[in-house]
Amino acid sequence: MTHAHITSWLITIVLFFLAVSMERQGAGKAKIVQMVLRLFYILTIVTGLLLLHSIASISALYWLKALAGLWVIGAMEMVLAAEKKGKSAAARWTQWVIALAVTLFLGLLLPLGFDLF
């Protein structure tokens, strides 16, 4: 399940950058990419919940990582909304980067992640 989760969030990030790029160019198919992106949000959340459910003893850090993961998805939607409205998205991009960094740090720190820290 770990590989499915990692694959889903990697594809989600790629689709996010593609959606932002297409929105900036005013491409008509940007809406389709955003809908596929939202499908991958759901897939990422479901695989994350399945991973969380498979842990025997869930510490507070796992719940914090789950909340940080939801924060990443929320920040992605805020960036896309700002880009669509033509508003400045600098603060939203900063929020997304911070949320992603926190989530990746916790993911690598916890036992289900890789042994980097």
Curated annotation (Swiss-Prot):
An example Gene Ontology CC term for this record: plasma membrane
Bilayer topology annotation: Multi-pass membrane protein
Disulphide bridges: none
Coiled coil, from the record: none
Main location: membrane
Subcellular location: Cell membrane
Keywords per UniProt: Cell membrane, Membrane, Transmembrane, Transmembrane helix
InterPro entries for the chain: UPF0344
Pfam families, A to Z: DUF1516
Membrane-spanning segments: 1-21, 39-59, 60-80, 97-117
Entry similarity comment: Belongs to the UPF0344 family.
UniProt-recorded name of the protein: UPF0344 protein GK0697
UniProt lineage: Bacteria, Bacillati, Bacillota, Bacilli, Bacillales
